[in-house]
Amino acid sequence: MKLVLLGAPGAGKGTQAEILSRKLNIPTISTGNILRAAMKNGTPVGLKAKSYVESGKLVPDDVIIGIVCERLAEPDCANGYILDGMPRTIPQAEALEQHGIDIDTALSIEIADETIIERMSGRRTCKDCSATLHIVSNPHKVEGKCDLCGGELTIRKDDAPETVKARLDVYHAETEPLKDFYAQRGKLVSVDNQPTIEATTAAIEKALGLE
């Protein structure tokens, strides 16, 4: 199965990608991870990307697409893969098609913005051991202190409500249109995010016919 995962930041794509990857025995391809690997391994496209990163510039789409195609040509992708975080825009999706990358299904995990903001802004990270707690779903025992090491709990900049809202705005403007893109090709499957990871996994497996 060749799968693209869609959904807003905080929808749980990474978690579900890991679960599906184990169940289907196919790799999860995360753009950030393969970009770092390509640069570290010094592949031709990786070296090109490195020149942009080192000069503080955004890596252009054609280089990102090149790195993705390079990774998908590896033997472990022969039976399928899960693309997480790629494509992010319609031009990227069109470029993948032009390179002969034909996915089977685009799975969209649906969740309300308000729920995402509540989830992410409720996260607290320990300054000392980097453990993550949540003031609602996994509350700490002592106010402002990590249960594991007693370190100070902080809100990461990425989890601040204004940052989360800004990321959601970008998602709605740039990535959400991909749902129509894949729906027009008869490849979109949508699943509502559930209150628990297990329930969301069950809904995904049912939608994909993996029960």
Functional labels for PLM-detected ranges:
Residues M1-E211:
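Glycine-rich phosphate-binding loop of ATP-dependent small-molecule kinases
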